[in-house]
Amino acid sequence: MSNISLYCLPYSGGSAAMFYKWRSVLSDNITLRPLEPAGRGTRIRQPLCLTMVDAVAALYHPFVKHYTGGDYAIFGHSLGGIMAFELVHYILDHGHDMPCALFFSGCRPPDRASHEVILHTLPDQAFMEEIVKLGGTPVDVFRNKELMTIFTPIIKNDYRLYEQYVFQAKARTLTCPIVLFHGDADNLVMQDELLAWEKFTTRKTRTIIFPAADHFFVDKHFEQVVGYVNQTIESLEIVG
């Protein structure tokens, strides 16, 4: 089997660093390439993007910097899943090949992104209290005042991206398999919503459920998540 690049996108407030531990578990033929959203981590000096369109364009630049052709897959968790969906269409619009697989984790289908509750306009303290209740951001961030000072603007902006996101129908249907990861104790994404992902690809959609797992199963059960990524890529009909 040929080598495959795996591009990964983090959840709200997250950075590319959350994926570094994956390297010890990924198969040898998979090269990990975490994508850093602007305004955090290795791109902390860059301004935050205020729209999903700008955020995706900013993610394309590090993608194309490393992509030299060949097989690739994309993984995104939560907000990162919506970004991954938009990014793959942006990549295709710029003349690159279809990915060999897409992994959407803890993520509603793009046409079902929820705008029922708007949080990013709340004062900081009220905002933080609400997202802790929702389970939409790791609680550890809010136990450290220094981290809060750094990450609150980032997290609020990520919520802005999601809450102002409006799905636009695409010119194409994807032709790669989609794998969905879901924690059955996730109170942000309901399992029955995941069926709507099927219409976005002509290929098979597989759903993997993590029992008694909340929205952050991607951290707590990362070895299992990576195991399924390895298994999926191993099963693809790719000739080296």
What is each of the regions a protein language model found here?
Residues 180-182:
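Short beta-strand/loop motif that positions the catalytic acidic residue
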Residues 2-72, 110, 116-128, 210, ...:
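Active-site catalytic motif of lipid deacylating hydrolases and related acyltransferases
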Residues 153-171:
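Active-site nucleophile elbow and catalytic-triad environment of alpha/beta-hydrolase enzymes
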Residues 190-199:
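Short alpha-helix in the alpha/beta-hydrolase fold that links the catalytic acid
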Residues 76-80, 84:
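Gly/Ala-rich beta-loop-alpha elbow adjacent to hydrolase catalytic centers
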Residues 89-127, 163:
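Flexible "cap/lid" loop of the alpha/beta hydrolase fold
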Residues 185-189, 215-216:
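Acidic catalytic loop of the alpha/beta-hydrolase fold
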Residues 213-222:
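Catalytic histidine-centered segment of alpha/beta-hydrolase-like enzymes
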